[in-house]
């Protein structure tokens, strides 16, 4: 069924739940625009038998969307208050196959691999560790580069190594700790 996006939005922002804007979540994090969420899901196309790792839970809305499509979702959120709120919203929507963990993906170790990885914050460059968590024939959606012109890509894990498929240009706030080091200027 269709998930009410407003159920994942702060009360005072509910009238903006479907507007084409990024909604603030606190900690400098935002809920991505609905159009970007749609393109992300379209490019990943999680299947009913697949496992998904989401990096950056935020509101929990994308985790819920992924959970409706896939077999199971593990979602990482570095901020404890966001993680707790997201888990509560997922429970309220009766979505039982999504687990939110409070962890920093840049240092966390899953001890397993996944069919699909969805990274909801941008990175300066693609972390090798994320790619290593993909199952053979798995795929990862990630946005990388320098704001305001970043590239959304799918990283495909194949027997012959990894292939990067460019999807579209976009701009997205960085994953906590994953912004590029500022260029040194005099």
PLM regions: where:
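Class I SAM-dependent transferase core
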Residues: 1-53, 61-65, 69, 82-92, ...
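Positively charged
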Residues: 180-186
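Conserved nucleotide-cofactor-binding alpha/beta core module
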Residues: 45-163
């Amino acid at each position: 069924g269709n998930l009410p996006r407003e159920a994942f939005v702060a009360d005072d922002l509910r009238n903006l739940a479907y507007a084409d804007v990024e909604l603030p979540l606190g900690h400098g994090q935002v809920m991505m625009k609905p159009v970007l969420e749609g393109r992300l899901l379209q490019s990943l196309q999680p299947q009913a038998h697949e496992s998904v790792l989401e990096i950056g839970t935020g509101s929990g809305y994308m985790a819920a969307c992924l959970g409706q499509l896939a077999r199971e979702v593990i979602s990482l959120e570095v901020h404890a208050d966001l993680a707790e709120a997201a888990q509560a919203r997922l429970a309220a929507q009766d979505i039982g196959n999504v687990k939110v963990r409070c962890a920093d993906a840049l240092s966390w170790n899953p001890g397993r691999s996944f069919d699909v990885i969805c990274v909801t914050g941008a990175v300066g460059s693609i972390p090798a560790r994320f790619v290593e968590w993909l199952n053979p024939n798995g795929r990862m959606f990630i946005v990388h580069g320098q704001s305001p012109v970043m590239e959304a890509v799918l990283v495909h894990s194949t027997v012959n190594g990894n292939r990067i498929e460019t999807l579209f240009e976009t701009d997205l706030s960085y994953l906590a700790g994953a912004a590029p080091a500022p260029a040194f200027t005099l």
